[in-house]
């Protein structure tokens, strides 16, 4: 689960992290008042969307101006004017894709004098199953670019859960970033605060880009991106309240309500599969035979007839989908349940596109019998390869 920058900063401030004074507005008429509550003389006006690259992004609408989603203002009135230009407009960045995202919130904060920009992140290292620090002197840049071009400029190390965070972890970060004197002490304290927040709130990633040294020589969190483990949000009512459903794909949101693992993609063949590994293999083989998957959808091992029906509705709600491939290997999942769900869904949505079904495993004969006796135009497949070839042929012709 992702949250906005202003929410991330407010959360980190609760743990003592140094952030700029800021206000969030949803109406243009509130922007001047919000800006006037801060000292100035420089204000930063930031579009709030769940995507990176806002500063380098462009708005679709001409009246939003040529600048990106992060703008500087030298008066409260100018800050209000910039907020008005961006609110309700569509911002396109390298992470949003060409469709972009509508800006419904603007964050106005005090500007900061910047001496140095650095990169810092905490994340779950799946290889070591530990929380890891990642830092670099190359702040304000895309860290993937830094990793590709100058990997030696990135330091990464994990924290042993037996000891937890210790001051030497903070010193290691500080020295790698070239900090000195009081900045080292500030870094040790800040890293501890961030580590505590990460652990207590079940975060998956905490990215600060940039972490800066101000012109007064102090550390400050200038930008923050936080994502939480969706499986742990139930433990944190305060975190759950931060969810902005308008930033989420409606199909992914609907899927989450039925415990379906769904990710929208850009292809034309909808996929419904049980098991993440088989789902990825299904997407791969569709690409192998010359088409593109429209989604990743894992119905899981305990899917009911109702859940399968909802999965079908979600797939068919995507206007890009030109055909559907149902690929089920029934272990825990029974093939007859899948078959009943498929038939019910086809009848309910009035399916008008090719449908290929491959069933194997528990109650497979019952499943095939249900489909064969349904009277529906369903293309049966014997195996994964056969199914992929048939759906690609049906869609491509």
UniProtKB/Swiss-Prot annotation:
Q: Which GO terms describe its cellular component?
A: cytosol; succinate-CoA ligase complex
Point out the gene that encodes the protein: sucC
Q: Which GO terms describe its biological process?
A: succinyl-CoA metabolic process; tricarboxylic acid cycle
Please state what the protein is called: Succinate--CoA ligase [ADP-forming] subunit beta
Q: Which organism is it from?
A: Jannaschia sp. (strain CCS1)
Q: Which PANTHER family match?
A: SUCCINATE--COA LIGASE [GDP-FORMING] SUBUNIT BETA, MITOCHONDRIAL (PTHR11815:SF10), SUCCINYL-COA SYNTHETASE BETA CHAIN (PTHR11815)
Q: Which residues cross the membrane?
A: none
- Quaternary structure, from the entry: Heterotetramer of two alpha and two beta subunits.
Give the EC number(s) under which this enzyme is classified.
Answer: 6.2.1.5
Catalyzed reactions: succinate + ATP + CoA = succinyl-CoA + ADP + phosphate; GTP + succinate + CoA = succinyl-CoA + GDP + phosphate
Q: Which Pfam families match?
A: ATP-grasp_2, Ligase_CoA
Cofactor(s) in the UniProt record? Mg(2+)
**GO function terms (MF aspect):** ATP binding; magnesium ion binding; succinate-CoA ligase (ADP-forming) activity; succinate-CoA ligase (GDP-forming) activity
């Amino acid at each position: 689960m992702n949250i906005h920058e202003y929410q991330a900063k407010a959360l980190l401030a609760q743990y003592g992290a140094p952030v700029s004074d800021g206000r969030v507005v949803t109406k243009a008429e509130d922007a001047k008042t919000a800006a006037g509550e801060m000292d100035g003389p420089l204000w930063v006006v930031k579009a709030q969307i769940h995507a990176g690259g806002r500063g380098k992004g462009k708005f679709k609408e001409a009246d939003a101006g040529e600048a990106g989603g992060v703008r500087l203002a030298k008066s409260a009135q100018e800050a209000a004017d910039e907020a008005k230009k961006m609110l309700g407009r569509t911002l396109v960045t390298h992470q949003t894709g060409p469709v972009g995202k509508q800006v419904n919130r603007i964050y106005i904060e005090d500007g900061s004098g910047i001496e140095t920009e650095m990169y810092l992140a905490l994340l779950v290292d799946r290889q070591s199953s530990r929380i890891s620090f990642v830092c670099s002197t190359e702040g304000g840049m895309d860290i993937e670019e830094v990793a590709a071009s100058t990997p030696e400029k990135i330091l990464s190390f994990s924290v042993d859960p037996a000891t937890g965070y210790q001051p030497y972890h903070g010193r290691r970060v500080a020295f790698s970033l070239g900090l000195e004197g009081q900045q080292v002490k500030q870094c040790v304290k800040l890293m501890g605060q961030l580590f505590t927040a990460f652990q207590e709130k079940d975060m998956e990633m905490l990215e600060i880009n940039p972490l800066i040294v101000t012109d007064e020589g102090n550390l400050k969190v200038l930008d923050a991106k936080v994502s939480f483990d969706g499986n742990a949000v139930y433990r944190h009512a305060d975190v759950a309240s931060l969810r902005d459903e308008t930033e989420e794909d409606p199909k992914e949101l609907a899927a989450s309500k039925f415990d379906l693992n769904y990710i929208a993609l850009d292809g034309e063949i909808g996929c419904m599969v049980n098991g993440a590994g088989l789902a990825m293999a299904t997407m791969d083989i569709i690409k192998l035979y010359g088409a593109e998957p429209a989604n990743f959808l894992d119905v899981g091992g305990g899917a009911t007839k109702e859940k399968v029906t909802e999965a079908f509705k979600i797939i068919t709600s995507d206007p890009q989908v030109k055909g559907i491939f149902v690929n089920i290997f029934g272990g825990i999942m029974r093939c007859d349940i899948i078959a009943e769900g498929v038939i019910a869904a086809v009848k309910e949505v009035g399916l008008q596109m090719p449908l290929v079904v491959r069933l194997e495993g528990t109650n497979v004969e019952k499943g095939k019998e249900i489909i064969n006796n349904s009277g529906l135009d369903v293309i049966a497949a014997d195996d994964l390869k056969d199914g992929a070839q048939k759906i690609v042929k049906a869609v491509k012709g």
